[in-house]
Amino acid sequence: MATPVYIVLPSRPDHVVSTAKDHAVQGYTELHPYDPSQTEGRLWIFDNDGYIRLAANHNLVLDVNGGAAKEGNTVLSYPDKKDHAKNQLWVNKDCILHTKLDESFHLGVNDKGQVIITQKKEQRVILRAPASLEKRPSAWERHEGELNVVAVGAGNHDVWGVNHLEHIYHWDGSKWHQIEGAATNISVGLDGTVWCVNKAHEIYRLDRGTNKWSIVPGELVQVSVGNSHNIWGVNHLDAIYKWNADSNSWTFVDGQLTNVSVGHDGTVYGVNRAGNIYHYNGNSWDAVSGELVQIHVANKDLIVGVNKAGHVYRLKHGKDWEKLEGELSWVAVGHGGELWGANSAHNIYKALL
């Protein structure tokens, strides 16, 4: 039997998927606060057959209420290796749990804290070993390769970067692939949208099917992609722009920044030449305490940055900066808390927030 794991919502890593206290069959599962002293009903086993079993009772498995081909709640039931097994079997892809019946659906959590089947990427949950919750963030590990800029998409299988020679690379979870083209800055969204800029300030977006770049009107020195509908950038004059997909043009945003970042949920932060930090409220910029030279936003709950000394920080509760270990010149965070960074020597590091 596999090692027990927690099932965690990345945007709320202090909560885990749990059952009702009596572990009742057909009882709904919910999101509960993480407490290392309370594990019964909160630890799960993903076995070799594809069942997600309750660690406290291996006879109970996570099931889909009414089928797996639509959104719906999850419940506990007894494993059925005949008629209903297709609703009880799961596929683990990069620690994300998809239904075997239809892998476009995955396990997630709705706004009420109920564990559901969904296609919404921002709601999906991931597997985490107990040790990874007890020590968060995890220690930085050296990763192969050299980069100046790094970006994280849907997880550790979709990481992009550029090096000091302006070469573009994509990490697919097992190795780096050099991508045709040259860039000085690159960004990838949760939905896999990739944009970059080169030293001539030209802007390009990638066709993921052909790995070919197409030019985008405008000039930028830095671009940030939350998803295909949330793209921001700054130019060499520190002017700020937001992409309008409907008109295929840029909309000027008042203010001056040297670095801007947008999450898949539309959350936007930026820093200026003085190192001041700002949060966009939809109409104007609100000052945020602290000083940074680079900032990265996955969503409103996952925001990291580095200052001019190379110190790494994460924003907690939208106002308090927590210093993390390590010294980097660039940092990025994925929707699942995947931390990637590069230092002044171009060395690459990764961790888990």
From Swiss-Prot:
- Identify the stretches annotated as sequence repeats: 138-173, 174-210, 211-247, 248-282, 283-318, 319-353
The protein's name is Tectonin-2
Q: Keywords on this record?
A: Cytoplasmic vesicle, Lectin, Membrane, Repeat
| Limits of the Ricin B-type lectin domain | 44-93
Choose one Gene Ontology CC annotation of this protein and give it: cell surface
Keyword Chloroplast included in the entry's annotation: no
Subcellular localization(s) per the UniProt record: Cell surface; Cytoplasmic vesicle membrane
Region of interest: 6 X approximate tandem repeats = 138-353
Query: Where would you say this protein principally sits, based on its record?
Result: other
What family is it from? Belongs to the tectonin family.
Q: Please give the SMART domains that the UniProt record associates with this protein.
A: TECPR (SM00706)
Q: What does this protein do?
A: Probably involved in bacterial recognition. May be a lectin that function as part of a transmembrane signaling complex during phagocytosis.
Keyword Repeat among record annotations? yes
Protein encoded by which gene: TECB
Which PANTHER family does the entry mention? Answer: DYSFERLIN-RELATED, FISH-EGG LECTIN-LIKE ISOFORM X1-RELATED
